Amino acid sequence: MLRYLTAGESHGPALVSVVEGVPAGLPLTAEYINRQLGRRQRGYGRGARMKIEGDAVKFLSGLRDGLTLGSPIALLVENKDWANWSEIMSTHPGARTDEKAVTRPRPGHADLAGAIKYRHADLRNVLERSSARETAARVAAGSVARRLLEELGIRIIGQVISVGGVEAGPLSLAPEELEARLEKSELFCADQAAERRMMAAIDSAREAGDTVGGVFEIRAYGVPPGLGSYVQWDRRLDGRLAAALMSIQAVKGVEVGMGFAAARKTGSQVQDEIFYEQGRGFYRRTNRAGGMEGGVSNGEPLVLRAAMKPIPTLRRPLQSVDLITKEPSSAAVERSDVCAVPAACVIGEAAVAWELAGACLEKCGGDSLAELKDNWDRYLSYVRQV
């Protein structure tokens, strides 16, 4: 069983991920994970903290000589900004908790609900953990899963398709061409004309002291039919992937394939007809289902989209109420981004990679990479013969 936990506060000394269930013998390097961490920090519209943090992972356990051991993998990402917060965020009694205390909850954040739930008088005790800074640890864990998927021939590509109401046009690009174009983009958007308009929307929001959201799309190529299951609700692959994407901070909606547009169509306009060709097997000429039917992958590329709301921390804060005095007040202002949709896209890739890797291990198992690949190859051979 593949699982992970993260720990750490936004301005604490570090973030930690503990990953369990990775087969032994998987080649893995810090450089590989650091590349994904670096992609998470990119993106037009990011805030000042991205200039402070240069995220890099340290392996504390689970590897030797560049190979996984099959034991839990502990990954640490240091917070460079800790030097400025060490006394305020100290774990020892006597921390200067009176400094930079937050008592004015921000609409749209976990501040007020978290304070009520955990009985905190200082909202910093909530926002330090609910912060999207935690996603650096998630990307580190998801990168391990992504590396495993590469060994099985599965490729994950994310792209931003909407920012601030500006929509990218549909493009028919091969995965290699799409990936190359996205790496050159400041917003991970393949439509260059739309990207320029998106950047203008971000600039306008920045000047107005506001923020913008958007939509990102994740595609997974090379996924065979048969991952996931229809026999129980919690084993349905589309449900697991949707939950993983919904767990990302500020994501408010997820769709698969046609998604919500399917509700406005007739059945004959939505389903993907089935064809068969000798040497190719079963295939579809359309992929409106997004690569999954009945909670099971069907052999077509997986296609998911997630909608991210505008970041709720605003330089021109909204109305709030002081937690202590109960007096009307403007919401607190913390350092933040104008747009973090590109970062959310990278986090989405990690989330999808994690769930897919888990589904692959459930299907074919293996305590070592060699055993997993043997089982995987036998299954693919069977699929080709059906």
Swiss-Prot record:
Cofactor note: Reduced FMN (FMNH(2)).
Alphabetized UniProt keyword annotations: Amino-acid biosynthesis, Aromatic amino acid biosynthesis, FAD, Flavoprotein, FMN, Lyase, NADP
Assigned GO CC terms: cytosol
Positions with a binding annotation for FMN: 129-131, 249-250, 294, 309-313, 335
Enzyme Commission designation: 4.2.3.5
Stretches assigned to coiled coil: none
SUPFAM superfamilies for the chain: Chorismate synthase, AroC
GO biological process assignments: amino acid biosynthetic process; aromatic amino acid family biosynthetic process; chorismate biosynthetic process
Function of the molecule: This reaction introduces a second double bond into the aromatic ring system.
HAMAP family cross-referenced by the UniProt entry: Chorismate_synth
Family of this protein: Belongs to the chorismate synthase family.
UniProt-recorded name of the protein: Chorismate synthase
Taxonomic placement: Bacteria, Bacillati, Bacillota, Clostridia, Eubacteriales
